[in-house]
Structure formats: structure tokens, C-alpha cells
Amino acid sequence: MKNLYIPLLAVLCVMAIGCRQAEKKTNMNYRPLGNTGLMVSEISIGCGGFEKIDSAASLEMMTMALDSGMNYIDLYDANPKTRSNIGYALQGRRDEMIIQGHIGCIFKDGQHCRTRDVEEAKQGFEDMLTRLNTDHIEVGMIHITDSHEEWDELEGSPFLDYVFQLKNEGKIQHIGVSSHNAEVALKAAKSGWIEVIMFSLNPAFDRLRGGAIPWEKGAMDNLQAGIDPVRVELYDYCATHNIAITVMKTLGGGGRLLDAKTSPLGVAYTPEQCIAYCLSKPCVSTCILGIDNLDELKADLHWMHATDEEKDYTAVRKQEPAKADGDCTYCNHCSPCSMGIPIAKVNELLDKAEIEGLTPELQAQYDALPHHAGECTHCGACLSRCPFEVDIPTQMDRAKEIFGK
């Protein structure tokens, strides 16, 4: 009887794990992450919200996400609080989460910074592993490569040698790159060594810049109608070569596509329509969604139960598009500011004030910022880092005018 106990226990454990996986598969659909051999949930976790809550709330939010079948998280945020909160929330369940962690994103002087300095990148990466209580991450994501010059400098660099060293040491299992530039992303896809591309994809960003879309009869039968030709090539290449795209800015960045007033297209999409649009691309493995609290997570999880009618975005797509450039998506890629101004937060509060009117609550939030728009020197350093061609100095002038400093 004693000899039967251990095998029986093992069988029961396997059955329990199988039942749990089956339950998740029933509720959540999974897709291959390119050629990595990993299966990832169709919707996944953006990490920004974990900076705004405490460890207890982080645990509650992560538990709900995991129990619902979400198994992928993008960790671009180098803020020690964010990393520590996620590490705490994953205690005992690390093996249930696939981590896409960024290499070359550090937290310096209270701001997120992009770096290609090997020592800085190494310190930032080791800090991430320590705070996550893990010895590896599944996807090592080279942080923000948006220009041809940045890509050319990356290839053959000591920084890239370090990335390959991490893979050889088993600290990362797969190599990815994040980009907002379709031409650069296509270069990355054709490099032969990139397995995952984190790319900004949504109905607005896919449109031809500044051009009218010929919505002729039958055009909606081809979901690529009206998409920038370089993006078409990128999506097709990734699909045929089994390179995964993990989608950022699914809802337009800060949910801009969900409100006709803020949408660059002038029409409102639902979250389900945005997600369905992205997942219509065979190359897309998962849509990363920013989640600030349990209510937002619950709303995102409605995707699992959404009807075909709720997912249908074709009626909205028939609207004439506007230019998607020039609108801030609060992504923080413009940082660091030489004056310490939290540019993304200033722009977020400015947009709210212009849409809703300046309220005492908005003024109080602005006043509490460590630095204000009036300190902007118009040095222009942020402009070269903004993927969306936002006129940041002009935005700062507007914020100073509205908020008074």
C-alpha cells in the first residue's frame, strides 16, 4: 500500500493540474508565441498599474488575472515599486506567468530611461530578477528601437552581445524588441534572431498617414484594406516566418480609442472591438492591456465571454479616418526630461482638462507633480524620442496656460 501511495499521489497531482489547465482553456483562448513553443493568453497584462497600488492590491489583481487564465505580462516599467509589487504578487505562482521583461530600460533620478550602456542595462536587468524573485524571464525585450539609426547601432554592439549572453546563460529564453516604427520592426523581423516583436497596433495606427481610405464596396472583406503598406508587409512577414507580435497600445494608448472625443479617428471603439481587430492578424499572439485596478481588469476579462456581435468592428471601421500622429498616448517614451517634468502625466491631465474642463481635482493632481510644464526650456530633447510626433513644447505651453504654472 505504501508503494502505491507516491505514484497515486503523482497521478492525482497531474489530474489536478490538467483540470486547472482545462478550466483555463475553457475560459481563455491561447495562441502560439511565434516559434518559441510557448502558448499565451489572447489578452495579457500591462504593468503600469502596479506602480500605483500597494502589494496587497497587486496580489489581489494578479490572483484574479491568473485565475482567469491570463498568463503573459509585459514588464517595461523599471520602477522598483512596480517590480517588487509584481514579484510579491507572483509568489508561489511564478510558473503560471510568462514574463516579457525589458532590457535597456532603467529607473534613474525618479524617471524611466532608455539606455544602451551595458553596465546600466546589466544593473537594471539584475534588479528586475531580484525583485521578481526569479532567476530568469521568458522573453528578453530590447527596449524601444524606433529609428533606423538605433537599429543599425544595435547590431554588432556590446549591448547586443550582452543580450545574447543573457540567453546563453539561461536568464532569458527568447529575444524580442519593442518598436513603434513599422520599417524598423520589419528590419528586426528579417534579422533572423528576433523571435518576438512588441509593436503598437490598433485601428488608428494602422491607417495610412494623412490619406483618405477608399472604402469601396467589398473593401471590408479584406482586413488589410487601408493599412499602411509597410505594416502589411510586416504583418505578412511575421505570419509566414512564425515571428510573434505582442501588441501594445491596443486601445490607442490610455484608452483613447474608446471615446469619440479623444479618438484620432473621431469614432469610439469598444475594448472588444479593438482586441478583435488586433487578433484578426495571424501574426498577433496577445494584446497587452493597461490595467490600473480590479474594475478595469474585470472589464478586460469580459473579452472571454464577448459575443461575435460585441467583437464586430466593421461598422466602426467604415468611418473616414483622421491622422493618428500628434496625439500623446502617455507612453513615457519621451522621458527623461532634463527638467524632471513628468511629460506623460502633464499631457494626460491637460487632455482631461480640455475635454472635461479644469476641475479642482485635476488642478490638485497637477499641483502635486514634482515639476510643472512652466519649467519647460523648449530644449527639444524629448521630440526625438516621441514615436507619435507630439509637439511636446507646445503641449507644455498649453498646460502652463491652463494650470497656471
Residue spans of the language-model regions?
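Acidic (Asp/Glu)-rich catalytic clusters
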Residues: 34-37, 67, 87-98, 129-135, ...
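Beta/alpha (TIM)-barrel catalytic core signal, keyed to glycine-rich beta->alpha loops juxtaposed to Asp/Glu
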Residues: 145-348, 355-356, 361-368, 394
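Short, acidic/polar
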Residues: 52-65, 116-133, 179-187, 269-277
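N-terminal binding-site loop/beta-alpha segment at the start of enzyme catalytic domains
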Residues: 19-101, 162
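Structural preference for beta-strand elements that scaffold enzyme active sites
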Residues: 32, 40-44, 71-72, 96-100, ...
